[in-house]
Amino acid sequence: MLVISAGKNEIFDFALPMGVGLVDMAINLTKFLQKRSCVGADEKSINLKNIDPRYLAKIEAKFANSSNPELQNLSQNLSKNPGQNLYQMPEKIVFVGSAGLYKDGEILQIYESSVGANVEISSIENRSYSPIECEISSIVSRGTIKTNSSNFITTDKNLAYKMFEKGYFLENMEFFSVLKVAQIFKIPAYGIFVATNFCDENAHADFIKNHSAAKELLTRYVKENM
């Protein structure tokens, strides 16, 4: 099992930071999984003992020498247990992080989700459309809660309610990318979220106010249930 987070202000001792937002998360998670598959943790289950250790060292060095500080931190975390973490494809991916509530729900409550979307506010107002897939369901079911992802945080309560009417319960910046990458690699994935705010004019202030308590709650939940 691979547990990941966005990183920056959401660092956990049990999760690898992969990047904030849709783009960084997609790039870094893809790089991470691709390096594992290149090592040989594919359907053929190549025996790692037969692989030249110098080749494995080169792969790990690419993480350490990256200009991306999150990948450098990831390399340091991997070195604690390289046999388990670096050279095997995970049986599932669990993303942990904070989320906003569109309408219903409670602050500092834990929610699990295995359905992610990338629906922009402009499409709710019929000002845009997308010709590509905008919603993904993981091959592992974790309830019916749908999580929408965007690089922009919703701060208009009326628009947030419209998102809720469309079936979306949570807002998190990275989750859609996690599910999309996991889908490509055919890995089950789901998210564990703690609500820090409602998506309204107080979204940022409430996020700041509740974030420390949210991280503690999420840490306790993960360590007690996983």
Can you annotate each of these PLM segments?
Residues 10-37, 52, 86-226:
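Glycine-rich phosphate- or other oxyanion-binding loops that anchor nucleotides, phosphorylated ligands
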Residues 34-89, 122-123, 127:
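Intrinsically disordered, low-complexity terminal tails and inter-domain linkers enriched
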Residues 1-2:
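Extreme N-terminal starter segment of soluble prokaryotic enzymes
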